[in-house]
Design a protein with these regions (language model features):
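Short, flexible helix-loop junctions that flank or precede catalytic/ligand sites
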Residues: 4-366
Length: 366
């Protein structure tokens, strides 16, 4: 089987859009890219992969191939190939052919187009549906944070929130929590997601309607009639979804969800701003977990510098100096007063040579 580098070598000379798209998707899968960006310019289309959170240019396609490549992707995603002046969204499933370990690797691809000056910009989100889901032990939590997180999952009711910006790994942590819950006694677990990112065998997963016929609040009210033990809501977006989540948490259900705040303690302020009675916070919010993602230093080539461990680059990591990502976490529990610091977690990971000072500055700022 060809490597990602071999697939992309001389790909710009291909005149068959089917082959070119296939090579881009194959290379993206082999490099574990989370996103593919196709950015049109006057004379070419820049192809970039987001690998471990960082964008890398991997290919330049001649401008003459732009429409053919975009049309091929639109056909796969069942989009209107004639519509080039309005944004479109769609998706498709794709499997890598050939022999070897990746022969049957399924890939769910979400596609979005945006008309720009020199054509249509295309972004592909790659979801490896057959890939192994991370467990709590693999997220990167410290022993104390992990113990607090697992303890709250054993509680029969209450609200558990994952907070952080987009792309900070909140959904991955939610799925890890669901997997942990499924290890114990049989539970009726129902999720409401927008969209469903990964199928979880044994879990009833509902998807929010993009036309807003079924929003988070409506879906949550409905699923409570199905006798759930655990409810996972993709995101608490407004006062209606918050009200439904709080009622579920106060009536004997364990509710897991996400919120956009910068740190764990700010989740309380955000909930109150959205309409939660401050007196209900300790009785409702069991735990808020704030997180960020940073790149792991490649263990094969990391070097000890003046400011600690630093990236170098080798064959094993493709010259990047990093391989994979790990979470930075902090916890806050209003009921018990538990409060840990993401800055302390970051410092511990730098000192241990897991990540670099530069990555911490990128993720947390100065």
């Amino acid at each position: 089987m060809l490597s990602a580098q071999e697939l992309l070598a001389h790909a710009e000379s291909l005149t068959d859009s089917v082959q070119l798209v296939d090579r881009i998707l194959r290379a993206g899968l082999l490099l574990h890219a989370s996103d593919v960006h196709l950015d049109p310019a006057a004379d070419s289309v820049r192809v970039r992969f987001r690998i471990d959170g960082a964008l890398e240019e991997v290919l330049r396609i001649p401008a003459a191939m732009q429409n053919a490549v975009t049309s091929r992707l639109k056909v796969l995603a069942s989009l209107d190939i004639a519509e080039r002046r309005a944004p479109q969204d769609g998706g498709f499933s794709w499997r890598m052919g050939g022999a070897g370990a990746f022969a049957a690797s399924p890939l769910d691809v979400r596609m979005a187009t945006l008309p720009v000056r020199h054509g249509e910009r295309v972004t592909l989100r790659l979801l490896e549906t057959g890939g192994k889901r991370l467990g709590i032990a693999e997220l990167g939590m410290s022993d104390s944070d992990r113990a607090a997180f697992e303890a709250v999952l054993r509680r029969p009711h209450g609200l558990v929130l994952l907070t952080g910006p987009t792309g900070s790994g909140k959904t991955t942590t939610l799925y890890a929590a669901i997997q942990e819950l499924m290890k114990g006694e049989p539970l009726n677990i129902i999720t409401v997601e927008d969209p469903i990112e990964y199928e979880i065998p044994g879990v009833a997963q509902a998807e929010v309607d993009s036309a807003d016929k079924v929003n988070f609040a409506k879906a949550l009210k409905s699923l409570l009639r199905h006798d759930p033990d655990v409810v996972m809501i993709g995101e608490i977006r407004d006062s209606d979804s918050l009200d439904a989540a709080v009622k579920a948490a106060l009536t004997g259900h364990l509710v897991l969800s996400t919120l956009h705040t910068n740190d764990a303690k700010s989740s309380v302020t955000r909930l109150v701003d959205m309409g939660l009675d401050p007196n209900l916070v300790p009785a409702t919010l069991r735990l808020a977990v704030a997180q960020r993602l940073v790149r792991r230093l490649c263990p094969e080539c990391r070097t000890k510098g003046v400011r600690g461990w630093e990236p170098k680059g080798c064959v094993a990591c493709g010259g990047r100096g990093y391989w994979g990502r790990i979470g930075l976490f902090e916890m806050y529990a209003p009921e018990t007063g538990l409060s840990t610091s993401i800055a302390d977690d970051a410092r511990a990971k730098v000192d241990a040579g897991i990540t670099s000072e530069a990555e911490i500055l990128r993720a947390l700022g100065g």
